[in-house]
Amino acid sequence: MTRSTAFFINGGAGRVICSLPAFELYEKENPDDDFIIVCEGGMDFYKGHPTLHNRAYDHWHKGLFEEHIKDRNCVTPEPYRVWEYYNQKCDLAQAFDIDINNKGLRKVGDPKIYANKQEIVQAATIVEEIKQGTGKDKVLVVQPFGRTTETHGDFIVDPTSRSFQLNNIVDIINVLKKEYAIIIMSEIPVPLEETENKQYPVAQPQIPDLRIWSSVIDVADHFLGCDSLGQHMVKALDGTATIITGSTYPINISYPDDPKFDIIDVGDGKRVYAPIRLTMEEEQDRHNDEVMELTTKQIDEICNSVRKH
């Protein structure tokens, strides 16, 4: 008797979103496999999916082992350990497909987030309140930091150089807040000039539900981010984005072939590949330490990219 499969998906929500096309293909190509997905990092973005929602389980689900795992083979896909990924031949969604489906490098569909009425209305209410508070009609969501960011006293640092430098993103926000209702998507508050904030307020809502954040991005006019979750939400919502890449390669972590994505690669020609989830070397992060330091010209380029949308 052939056993079905229990796939274990770990990591952040961006990885979950990028896994969706691979699982859709697996379901289509393996109709006899009654597979499940064990969500070690949460099942938020399997929710609402027409077929995958019923296959997804939080890893604390009661009876998960005895009722669902015990009679299945366990598989843990790791896209960062796929040859095509760490040699810059594919993106994250394709790496999941290679690892899960074993069909080699091929084109995969776009992920999709399925929001319900409550999520849409709640996000629309948040955005409308911010528009009224700022007096601006156009809304820009800014995600300045990736998940590797750390705080040390008053300092905000990303040792992997995937995030904006604090002084750079503050400069960018100070320019764009005069033209847009800006919503900062960050668990870490961004320190802005208080006197200017009274004239040009910037919203920093603490929204714990990532699905609400995805709906906020959907309602907004544009997204500005780095190597972080938000851009994968934008892709799954068919939105527009300006993405700044430094220590990571656009082909791996973003969508350079999507005309709705304007990717400004400030690390081009300067970075080396950091073997995330492969080794614990620190040499690469040290080499990449300054790749996200922006020049005045690059800051102008970023602001102009946002204005195009």
What are these regions (language model features)?
Residues M1-A93, S215, G230-H232:
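Active-site and donor-binding regions of nucleotide-sugar-utilizing enzymes
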Residues S4-A6, V139, H222:
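Structural motif
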Residues F8-I9, V38, V142-Q143, M185, ...:
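Short hydrophobic segments within beta-strands
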Residues I17, F155-I251:
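Donor-binding and catalytic core of enzymes assembling or modifying cell-surface/extracellular glycoconjugates
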Residues I36, E67, D71-P77, I183, ...:
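Hydrophobic/aromatic beta-strand patches that form the interior of the parallel beta-sheet core
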Residues N54-H59, Q204-Q206, D262-D268:
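Short acidic-hydrophobic, aromatic-tinged amphipathic segments that line or gate anion-handling sites
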Residues E78-N87, D110, Y114, Q122-E194, ...:
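Active-site donor-nucleotide binding/catalytic segment of nucleotide-sugar enzymes
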Residues V82-E129, D257-H309:
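Leloir-type glycosyltransferase catalytic cores
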